[in-house]
Amino acid sequence: MVDDAEKKLLADVGYRIRETRAGQGLSLEQLARLTGISAPALSLIETGKRDPRLTTLKRIADALRVPPATLMADGSDTIEPSASATSEGYDLGEYQ
């Protein structure tokens, strides 16, 4: 089951793909031809209804001529550790 955070991530990634594609003047069908991914599958990704594999995101990014991270970025310049990571830390056990 997909939780709310995952739904938001999928919707955000889809939005960035759609905005990048549209900004480059590409139709969904044109991107489909460039990636080898069907237009209906791309539509599901763009609307956040399908969870694309990393290799699929790479194909889309390559076709759009952007780094794959661009499609995953949330607009912030820095990555902040989550509250649980900083308060609980990590148990490295035998790796220390």
Model-derived segments and their meaning:
Residues M1-G23:
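A short, Lys/Arg-rich alpha-helix, primarily the initiator
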Residues V2, A73-Q96:
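Short, charged recognition helix plus adjacent turn
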Residues Y15-L34, R59:
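Short basic helix-loop element that most often maps to the first helix and adjoining turn
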Residues R33, L44, A73:
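Phosphate-coordinating loops and pocket residues in cytosolic domains that bind phosphorylated ligands
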Residues G36, T55-T70:
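DNA major-groove recognition helix of helix-turn-helix/homeodomain DNA-binding modules
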Residues G36-D51:
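Recognition helix of helix-turn-helix/homeodomain-like DNA-binding domains
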